[in-house]
């Protein structure tokens, strides 16, 4: 079975070795046919602490690392222009 991957934007990096990634998915409403955007936040493991807020990242599913953390940082796709 292939590993699940998601692309999202880092919204928080205040925890040690953990980032919060916002992933948006678009779908069509079954009755009204309006395009809706669903946003979900995932906790991901960032071993080296290389991510900053606003970075676009690729995360992969992995074994449970804690109660809510089941994703790991695969790579940083683009760095944010915001400097913290």
Swiss-Prot record:
For molecular function, the Gene Ontology terms on record are: rRNA binding; structural constituent of ribosome
- Pfam families in the record, alphabetically? Ribosomal_S17
- Which InterPro entries does the record match to this protein? NA-bd_OB-fold (IPR012340), Ribosomal_uS17 (IPR000266), Ribosomal_uS17_bact/chlr (IPR019984), Ribosomal_uS17_CS (IPR019979)
Query: Which domain of life does this protein belong to?
Result: Eukaryota
Cellular location(s): Plastid, Chloroplast
Alphabetical keyword list: Chloroplast, Plastid, Ribonucleoprotein, Ribosomal protein, RNA-binding, rRNA-binding
Name a single GO cellular component.
chloroplast
List the Gene3D superfamilies hit by this protein, alphabetically.
Answer: Nucleic acid-binding proteins
Q: Which GO terms describe its biological process?
A: translation
> Where mainly found?
plastid
Kindly state the subunit structure of this protein.
Answer: Part of the 30S ribosomal subunit.
What does the record give as the function of this protein? One of the primary rRNA binding proteins, it binds specifically to the 5'-end of 16S ribosomal RNA.
Family assignment from sequence similarity: Belongs to the universal ribosomal protein uS17 family.
What is the protein name given in its UniProt record? Answer: Small ribosomal subunit protein uS17c
Specify the species.
Answer: Trieres chinensis (Marine centric diatom)
Q: Which gene encodes it?
A: rps17
């Amino acid at each position: 079975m292939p590993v699940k991957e998601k692309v999202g934007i880092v919204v928080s990096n205040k925890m040690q070795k953990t980032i919060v990634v916002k992933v948006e998915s678009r779908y069509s409403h079954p009755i009204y046919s309006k395009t809706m955007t669903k946003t979900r936040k995932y906790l991901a493991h960032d071993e080296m602490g290389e991510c900053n807020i606003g970075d676009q990242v690729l995360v992969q599913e992995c074994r449970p690392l804690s109660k809510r953390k089941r994703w790991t940082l695969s790579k940083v796709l683009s760095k944010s222009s915001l400097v913290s």
